[in-house]
């Protein structure tokens, strides 16, 4: 069995490439996308349709409802499930998506034993300041408004009495994916900008606004996934703060900002990877599978 990851910024063509490669290499697919995992979040997540997926088995799509929490630990369990299936059924495994943090966790591992359900009993800024005073070296790597990571660091401190740095020294991370070849799709900025604009336009024409109205009515705005790009801007439109034209423009702008963050993360975190334009990358991947 071979396993690969296809990464790249949002709207770079990862999904289409993964489907094409999977059909030629007897592969199953694990979606590396923190939004595709949710049922009923279809248009805004740009998840492949059932028709597009065809007979290719997918893990990580439509796993939970939007009011159910899904985090990196849940993703690790999904990876184990997908890999077990691939091994039992003599399949290859393609991991594809833009949530680089999940992929990083697969490669580097997570320290186990912390109760993920411990929540902040003080504000995010207060928790950050407290942790910074105790462990400046670790907290310098976290943005002050990054609620998820501040909450995790705070949970470590509350449960163990140790600073994150000391905790990770005593509980080294255990990597899960050890032989994972990473392929990255590259695009020129202006070309990607056109792709993002086109995808945003297609989303709106396909019923994005109606989808968000439905999701809000059923789940409210409270779940973490309801703060995703495409959803928050639509809430602004529904609140009368944006025109339809401004909605489309703002989603595209925020998507490009996300693409920049993804590219920066991929560049800094995944050093041993093959990067190429999409047409050439297709050939690179097929060559790897033929070795």
Swiss-Prot record:
It holds the Pfam family IPPT. Substrate binds at residues 10-15. The record marks 99 as: Interaction with substrate tRNA. Disulfide bonds: none annotated. Its EC number is 2.5.1.75. Gene3D superfamilies: 1.10.20.140, P-loop containing nucleotide triphosphate hydrolases. SUPFAM superfamilies: P-loop containing nucleoside triphosphate hydrolases (SSF52540). Residues 33-36 are annotated as: Interaction with substrate tRNA. NCBIfam families: miaA (TIGR00174). Catalyzes the transfer of a dimethylallyl group onto the adenine at position 37 in tRNAs that read codons beginning with uridine, leading to the formation of N6-(dimethylallyl)adenosine (i(6)A). This is tRNA dimethylallyltransferase. The gene is miaA.
């Amino acid at each position: 069995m071979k396993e690969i990851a296809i990464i790249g910024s949002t709207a770079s063509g990862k999904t289409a490439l993964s489907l094409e490669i999977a059909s030629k290499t007897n592969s199953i697919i694990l979606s590396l996308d923190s939004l595709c995992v949710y049922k009923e979040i279809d248009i805004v997540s740009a998840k492949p349709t059932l028709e597009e997926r065809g007979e290719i088995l997918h893990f990580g799509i439509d796993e939970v409802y939007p009011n159910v929490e899904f985090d990196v630990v849940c993703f690790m369990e999904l990876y184990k499930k997908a890999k077990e299936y691939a091994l039992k059924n003599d399949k290859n495994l393609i991991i594809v998506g833009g949530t680089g943090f999940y992929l990083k966790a697969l490669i580097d591992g997570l320290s186990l034993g912390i109760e993920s359900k411990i929540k902040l009993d003080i504000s995010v800024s207060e928790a950050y300041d407290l942790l910074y005073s105790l462990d400046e070296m670790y907290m310098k790597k976290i943005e002050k408004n990054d609620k998820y990571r501040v909450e995790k660091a705070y949970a470590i401190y509350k449960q163990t009495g140790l600073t994150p740095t000391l905790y990770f020294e005593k509980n080294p991370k255990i990597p899960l994916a050890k032989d994972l070849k990473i392929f990255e799709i590259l695009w020129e900025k202006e070309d990607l900008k056109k792709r993002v604009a086109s995808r945003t336009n297609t989303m709106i024409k396909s019923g994005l606004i109606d989808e968000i109205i439905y999701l809000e009515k059923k789940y409210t705005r409270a779940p973490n996934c309801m703060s995703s790009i495409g959803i928050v801007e639509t809430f602004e439109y529904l609140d009368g703060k944006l025109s339809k034209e401004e909605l489309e423009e703002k989603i595209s702008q925020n998507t490009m900002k996300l693409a920049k963050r993804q590219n920066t993360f991929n560049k800094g975190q995944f050093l041993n990877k093959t990067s190429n334009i999409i047409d050439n990358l297709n050939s690179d991947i097929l060559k790897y599978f033929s070795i």
